[in-house]
A protein has these predicted regions:
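Short, charge-rich binding segments
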Residues: 46-48, 56-59, 105
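C-terminal nucleotide
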Residues: 1-29, 54-87, 184-331, 346-386
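FabD-like malonyl-/acyl-CoA
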Residues: 130, 342-346
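Glycine-rich phosphate-binding loop
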Residues: 339
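A structural signal for short, well-ordered beta-strand segments
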Residues: 113-115, 210-212, 343
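Gly/Ser-rich oxyanion-binding loop with an adjacent helix/lid
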Residues: 1-24, 30, 34, 39, ...
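Short Gly/aromatic-enriched secondary-structure transition segments
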Residues: 41-48, 226-227
Length: 386
């Protein structure tokens, strides 16, 4: 069931003084294409979704924040002047946002708050960014008269991850959550942080995630290996072309020229990243022309590259991609870092029911459990609901 304002408001009234506050929301996100491109200075292509976090907030006239997690049935009090903050991660997000906003000179005061979310956990849809963005947006409204620009609010969320959670993330998740726009995806340039909206209104198609329910343990070490491969190829190119700073600057011809200087594994991984740069730009053109068949074709190409060139897939994800292809699904690929998580699928309305039924049955026969089906609609970014 869809999370509503009433769900949060009833718990807020119940846990605090019986009066109501202001209600804010921020979404999770998907990334249509542009995977493992962020740390290579390339493009990503996210969109906000209709699943997100809803929080009710009311200043309480003290220096204390009193927070209640509806989903976890957990409560905490912390002082805004405390250097350490609460230990529970879900409350550290709120604490971190408060501290980062205070660093910007926002006169944050104590408040009561209750919050809940319906972003599926473990699906790579950035529930944490939704939580951070909700509170950054709310504190800007309540204590700064909305003087902090959206770009800075996204960076507040990123800084919270870095400084209070210990996750050295990029900016995409928070950016998509704050800047999301219904009916549009964003092409975000990870080098300049410039972005542009592109129409995404696929009439006759649905966007659906299939969560494999697996996460293979080698993900973090494999991520570092691949990042090093990219750096190795850039170093080789830089000897020939000093202006090359990342694979964003590279072409296939340049890669061919330095192949004798790098390992075959490194070259193959660089080939994927270079190709993904072009695929994102090709998807931009396809969306402007309303050509969703071409979008789907590029999604399949990305999956092939992630599986066979960048080698971040796993049997479960390749199986789901194969099922999608055999069912005539328009487009399908790994979404996220790989080694588990979800596939993102663009499927025509007339094939949707058969695809879901076939995928669930075949996956259960092969792996002993069904994938979790998550229907996705592109929605708006951070906002005040009431």
């Amino acid at each position: 069931m869809k999370l509503t304002v009433d769900d949060v408001r009833s718990r807020f009234v119940e846990h605090f003084d019986g009066t109501t506050g202001s209600v804010y929301s921020s979404p999770g996100r998907i990334n249509l294409i542009g995977e493992h491109t962020d740390y290579n200075g390339g493009f990503v292509f996210p969109g906000a979704v209709t699943q997100g976090v809803i929080a009710e907030i009311k200043p309480n006239g003290t220096r204390k924040v009193r927070a209640y997690s509806i989903d976890l049935k957990d409560y905490v009090e912390f002082s805004l002047d405390d250097e350490k903050g609460p230990s529970a991660t879900h409350f550290r997000f709120i604490f971190g946002v408060c501290r980062e906003m205070m660093k910007l000179g926002v006169p944050v005061e104590g408040f009561n708050t209750a919050f809940a979310g319906d972003v599926p956990l473990g699906a790579g849809m950035s529930s944490s960014a939704a939580l951070e963005s909700t509170y950054a947006f709310a504190l800007n409204d309540l204590f700064a008269d909305n003087k902090i620009d959206k770009f800075t609010l996204a960076k507040v969320g990123q800084a919270t991850e870095h400084n209070y959670i210990g996750c050295n993330c990029g900016i995409m998740d928070q950016f998509a959550s704050v800047f999301g726009k219904a009916g549009s995806l964003m092409r975000l340039d990870c080098r300049s942080l410039e972005f542009k909206y592109f129409p995404f209104d696929p009439k006759g198609y649905k966007l659906v995630l299939l969560n494999s329910q697996v996460k293979h343990e080698l993900a973090s070490s494999a991520y570092n290996d691949r990042r090093k491969s990219c750096e190795n190829v850039v170093a080789a190119m830089k000897r020939h072309w000093p202006n090359v700073d990342s694979l964003r600057d590279a072409t296939y011809d340049m890669l061919d020229e330095v192949r004798p200087e790098v390992s075959e594994e490194d070259a193959l991984r660089a080939k994927y990243v270079i190709g993904e740069k072009y695929r994102v730009l090709e998807v931009c053109v396809a969306l402007e022309e309303g050509d969703y068949e071409e979008v789907g074709k590029k999604m399949y190409e990305t999956h092939y590259g992630l599986s066979k060139e960048y080698e971040v897939s796993c049997p479960e994800l390749d199986f789901l991609n194969d099922v999608a292809h055999s069912c005539g699904v328009t487009g399908s690929r790994i979404m996220g870092g790989g080694f588990g998580g979800c596939t993102i699928n663009l499927v025509s309305d007339d094939l949707y029911a058969n695809f879901i039924e076939t995928a669930k049955k075949a996956y259960k026969e092969k792996f002993g459990k069904e994938p979790i089906v998550i229907d996705v609609v592109i929605g708006d970014g951070s906002r005040k609901l009431c």
